[in-house]
Amino acid sequence: MLKLIYTLGTGTRGIDNFLKIIKNFHIETVVDVRRFPTSKIEDFKKERLLLRCLKEGIEYIHLGDELGGYRKGGYEKWTKSDAFKSGIDKVAKIANNKIVCIICAETLPWKCHRRFIGKKLLTMGYRVIHIIDEKHTWVPKNESSKQMAFK
């Protein structure tokens, strides 16, 4: 059973750089947690991203309804909802068999709702690594005594 899950923000990087990072980390499934899966960058709009991932042999799953941000009452409150728990269970089920990367638009995970998703997955026994770029990852200090905050 694989117990590792990555996260990555699309940010302002291009699709080629995004896919290079995905491939460098041997990611098999991209789980899109954008509640509104659109972008100023055409290649990151849901339909185009889905097609591009499939072309590259990467599975694409959208879980924005369950795990997307921008929630009334705040995202922390949303983490207690049945929909959130359902989304987390779906991610966990996929991650038991494949290398998964949770994606959103925000580059920096500490400014994104991916940090709450990662925190929950951590309590379920998963190691969560937030990818910043090709050379840097981030794990909150209080979530890992074995890994530096930046690598």
Question: Predicted regions span which residues?
Answer:
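Residues lining hydrophobic/aromatic ligand-binding pockets adjacent to catalytic sites
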Residues: 1-151
